[in-house]
């Protein structure tokens, strides 16, 4: 597990590179996961899942923001496959510069 983490109130956010995910913990319990796959210089943010009983508390937004900041620090472009991530970036245009472009897309040859 990557030691990159941040505290968001009672929620701890962790970059779990071994499992290709970001995770949000309350105590020792995983309450949200954002799955990704790195393809060269592009990080595909594939899906975001928040435990139903934790929905509506901003945990999804916090984990997406954490993933975007981590990607920025690592110099990665973003492919927002996940609808929740796409919506977050639309509402927060300060992350639009991270979006994958034809120049940053990995070769598919």
Annotated model-derived regions:
Residues 2-13, 17, 92-109:
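Short, charged, intrinsically disordered terminal tails
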Residues 78-90:
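Conserved beta-strand-loop-alpha-helix junction that forms the acyl-donor binding cleft
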Residues 29-37, 44:
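Conserved beta-strand in the GNAT
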Residues 42-52:
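Conserved acetyl-CoA binding element of GNAT-fold acetyltransferases
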Residues 18-20, 41:
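Beta-strand-connecting loop/turn residues
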Residues 54, 58-63:
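Conserved acetyl-CoA pyrophosphate-binding loop and the N-cap/start of the following alpha-helix
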Residues 62-77:
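Conserved acyl-CoA
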Residues 20-31:
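Conserved beta-hairpin
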